[in-house]
Amino acid sequence: MSYRITGSTGEWEIVVGLEVHAQVVSEAKLFSGASAEYGGEPNTHVSLVDAGFPGMLPVLNRECVAQAVRTGLGLEAEINLFSRFDRKNYFYADLPTGYQISQFAHPIIGKGKVLVDLADGSTREIGVTRLHLEQDAGKSIHDQDPTRSFIDLNRAGVALMEIVSEPDIRSPEEAGAYLRKLRQILRYIGTCDGNMEEGSMRADVNVSVRKPGETEYRTRCEIKNVNSIRFVMMAIEVEAQRQIEVWEAGGTVDQETRLFDHVRGETRSLRSKEDAHDYRYFPDPDLLPLVIEQSWVDELKAALPELPEAKRARLEQEYGVSRYESSVLCVEQAIADFYETVARGADARLAANWMLGDFFAALNRTGRSIEDSPVSAEGLRELLGLISDSTINGKIAKEVLEDMVETGDSASAIVERKGLRQVTDTGAIESAIREILAANSDKVEEYKGGKDKLFGFFVGQTMKAMKGKGNPALVNETLKKLLSE
């Protein structure tokens, strides 16, 4: 179902394109040997190139180029064997050179696509226009002194990939799904950590509105540097609503750059939107055009890990998990790997149910992730094996899992220590049931008189008497036999 916003003149459609700035995972910066590591004391990860000292020449980091190519391959995009670096000229205090080295006319990556899953079960393809490499700027700090601002150049010169989508997004939900999928791909490939809270992935959001059926785009506004998926979705809604109100009041929307204030739930004008000529782009005279070999691209492609969509399809085929289950299991590569280790030696469906249910719930309660789980994949597999061979039942297994999370002990050790082995002795089960039936003779008569729901009562009382250790199937079977006497 199409997303629409209703105004005083009827329904409106939103049109969104996203420019995602993803920090490249590399040890050094794009054109210098300074560390690209996040954090550190201010101005400790700075070379003379980053600081814009006269006479310092940029030297391209080969690994950053490789990371851009890997990302392009992950986006099923065109890899341009010829690309070029340009100077984007503008003045800002945290840009020491007075220009940013970027790629304007000839980006390293061309058209690609991202496949996103939506809440209604449908799938949409969002086009990628281009990906280019560029330098990040430094950081201006305004809250340390009432009269002065400070500059930290640790981030200056760090390699960024700017990934530009086509204006294919038609709802806040689609924008969120696109960003989540893009981040997932980058993390799988290892080209960006996707930590939006650290600024290593942020989005500029281009929003316009139009009447359903219109084919031309109306004037768009760009919302700069939105640093969470939730805020991107909120910003789209409030900016679209603002533009609709402007159009319906008989006004026109100005092309401008805006900021999103999540506290007030509004966007505010920052400056008029710049065009390319405002930046006076020209080829960087200190850098040769970038020419890469197809054979190198092929090598990088052959070494890529299995990508999310391929992994999902394989899990569904090999292990019989549902589309929803595969989407959750493949959110992170570590989760998918954990699941496969469990499923290889256990009932694959049981493994999926337990991971998505009790196991994730236990991790969430203790504030842990899959990487620092106190229960290993082998440990969870052992627990599921105890269920499958009827050593313990599902209810007891939940108790054992809680103990495993708290103590780190193995499932079998906990079962032995606590005496939790399931009772499969039919004589012991029959004895327990006879005691329950004798103590509840009135309910036995009611059951035999047609009150079938009491069967669950007898099962519950039996399991309680056996401290949850009775084999459920044997309890049910024996109970039916005794009640029919």
From Swiss-Prot:
Enzyme class: ligase
PANTHER family hit by this protein: GLUTAMYL-TRNA GLN AMIDOTRANSFERASE SUBUNIT B MITOCHONDRIAL AND PROKARYOTIC PET112-RELATED, GLUTAMYL-TRNA(GLN) AMIDOTRANSFERASE SUBUNIT B, MITOCHONDRIAL
Quaternary structure (record): Heterotrimer of A, B and C subunits.
EC number, UniProt record: 6.3.5.-
GO molecular function, one term: glutaminyl-tRNA synthase (glutamine-hydrolyzing) activity
Highest taxon above the source species: Bacteria
Keyword flag Phosphoprotein: no
Family: Belongs to the GatB/GatE family. GatB subfamily.
GO biological process: glutaminyl-tRNAGln biosynthesis via transamidation; translation
Keywords noted in UniProt: ATP-binding, Ligase, Nucleotide-binding, Protein biosynthesis
Reaction catalyzed: L-glutamyl-tRNA(Gln) + L-glutamine + ATP + H2O = L-glutaminyl-tRNA(Gln) + L-glutamate + ADP + phosphate + H(+); L-aspartyl-tRNA(Asn) + L-glutamine + ATP + H2O = L-asparaginyl-tRNA(Asn) + L-glutamate + ADP + phosphate + 2 H(+)
Protein name per its UniProtKB record: Aspartyl/glutamyl-tRNA(Asn/Gln) amidotransferase subunit B
InterPro entries per the UniProt record, alphabetical: Asn/Gln-tRNA_amidoTrfase_suB/E, Asn/Gln-tRNA_Trfase_suB/E_cat, Asn/Gln_amidotransferase, Asn/Gln_tRNA_amidoTrase-B-like, GatB, GatB_C_1, GatB_Yqey_C_2, Gln-tRNA_amidoTrfase_suB_CS
Role description: Allows the formation of correctly charged Asn-tRNA(Asn) or Gln-tRNA(Gln) through the transamidation of misacylated Asp-tRNA(Asn) or Glu-tRNA(Gln) in organisms which lack either or both of asparaginyl-tRNA or glutaminyl-tRNA synthetases. The reaction takes place in the presence of glutamine and ATP through an activated phospho-Asp-tRNA(Asn) or phospho-Glu-tRNA(Gln).
